[in-house]
Amino acid sequence: MDFNLQAYQADHLLHLSAKPERRLSILENARHRWLEMDGVVQSAMSLSQPERLFLPHQPSIAERLPAQASRILGLGPGGGDLTRHLGARWPEARHDCVDLDAEILTLFQQFFQDASQRSPRLHHADALHFLLQSQDAYDLVLLDLFSQDGNPLLLFQAPIYQALARCLHGTLIVNLLPRTHLELAQAKRLAEEWIGPTSAHGVPGYRNVILHATNLA
């Protein structure tokens, strides 16, 4: 059964935390478990099929995944929807997940990690700092960073794309929530300049735009 963003109902509150900058809750019913931030669903998991994707922008990401990936980096994994999906698709792949919010990583481990899959390596770090310090090479990077009203400024500046160019030899997929056409144009220009050929794909009915870039250098 699909997770309906307009009609879901919770039977249990599994976790609640509130800070000045955000409120986190994890809820569950007989079929699904989900993570809400300030009342907005950020991740959703089927209890019987943890690898399924439910949120509106995620099929667009799944359609643009490469045929194969063995070294995956997730910047801003949230509740790990794509981490679980990729773990089922490529069981032998090595997966690193980076998040600035330590609580998000802890909640992923406690409530959203699929025990049947190879465990990802979790890193509590700033995304740009992690990239600058990393000595690893990746063939797939998923970039899904957000702030209260969209994406952080970082996604519209050159340094993160320059850092990605150094460690990426394959596919970059970015989940954008552009506030203006100028933000979208800026992110696409930077991805094309530093990564390679880039295409933008809107999600009907939502702000999300998925950027797909390829670096084969």
Positions of the model-derived regions?
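Rossmann-like AdoMet
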Residues: 1-69, 88
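The AdoMet/dcAdoMet-binding core of the Class I SAM-like
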Residues: 3, 52-166, 180-182, 204-206, ...
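Well-ordered beta-strand positions enriched in small/hydrophobic/aromatic, beta-favoring residues
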Residues: 35, 172, 210-211
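Conserved beta-strand signature within the Rossmann-like core of class I S-adenosyl-L-methionine
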Residues: 169-176
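Histidine- and/or cysteine-centered catalytic micro-motif in compact active-site loops
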Residues: 40, 146, 177
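Class I S-adenosyl-L-methionine
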Residues: 17, 182-217
